[in-house]
Amino acid sequence: MNTFSQVWVFSDTPSRLPELMNGAQALANQINTFVLNDADGALAIQFGANHVWKLSGKPDDRMIEDYAGVMADTIRQHGADGLVLLPNTRRGKLLAAKLGYRLKAAVSNDASAVSVQDGKATVKHMVYGGLAIGEERIATPYAVLTISSGTFDAAQPDASRTGETHTVAWQAPAVAITRTATQARQSNSVDLDKARLVVSVGRGIGSKENIALAEQLCKAIGAELACSRPVAENEKWMEHERYVGISNLMLKPELYLAVGISGQIQHMVGANASQTIFAINKDKNAPIFQYADYGIVGDAVKILPALTAAFAR
């Protein structure tokens, strides 16, 4: 048996739902999708859900992962085994841990490939900081996986599909975190995993002010702006949501233009699936040139304005 009888899907990030649903179609005979509202439920059916389970009644001061109890109860009531697919977001991983405990299931994070043999999931994901690919065969009846972005192609909606909708009522967990206040986060983040063209800056750009040069190039060619982890986490020059690497974004654009990025393996794991990699770096021995299809050795502060001017003609 090369499929599960049932798969259960949930995404706290709507943009990740299409790829999870496409993976579900390949891995199971029946697809169940947990959603938070009617609009997401209708979309899930178009993506192939046989059953939609709308999570309802959570107080505004509680977290989404507090639905784990009723989700696990629903899963157990409809089969003695099954596969759970979640995005590898922070909230997805929190929910995976809670579901794994309640279902007595093995949990595997950041899956980059999933297959089913004899009713058991085999999962591949990066290990040793991206230096190798590990493979796990999950022996527990239930398997809970968080899926890396780009593991599956996005499912295409089909308005002719039909499915059944059910309601799952909130049940307060015995122990929970209560939100007492919220603060809006200033962020201009985009869905970088959907971008065709990406310009990504590293500390070699020199300063936060010089990032404007990369932004101008983005406008000229219609690209999205990303960065390396040190730019976001250490220097605080850009938002966390924009950094590319093994612990965050895994991109597959048509073009990845790396500006002032050294090319350490932890970063390149998130970029080396790009169709074309173009590197700009002052250091001719930078590791990035081992991955690049094209490269320029030189000062990005001088090269970026020249590229922008050339594309603007």
Curated annotation (Swiss-Prot):
FAD binds at residues 255-283. One of its GO terms (biological process) is carnitine metabolic process. Pathway: Amine and polyamine metabolism; carnitine metabolism. The keyword Flavoprotein applies. Keywords: Electron transport, FAD, Flavoprotein, Transport. It comes from the Bacteria. It holds the Pfam family ETF. SMART domains: ETF (SM00893). The keyword Electron transport applies. PROSITE patterns: ETF_ALPHA. One of its GO terms (molecular function) is flavin adenine dinucleotide binding. Heterodimer of FixA and FixB. Required for anaerobic carnitine reduction. May bring reductant to CaiA. Belongs to the ETF alpha-subunit/FixB family. PANTHER family: ELECTRON TRANSFER FLAVOPROTEIN ALPHA, PROTEIN FIXB-RELATED. This is Protein FixB. It comes from Escherichia fergusonii (strain ATCC 35469 / DSM 13698 / CCUG 18766 / IAM 14443 / JCM 21226 / LMG 7866 / NBRC 102419 / NCTC 12128 / CDC 0568-73). The lineage of its organism: Bacteria, Pseudomonadati, Pseudomonadota, Gammaproteobacteria, Enterobacterales.
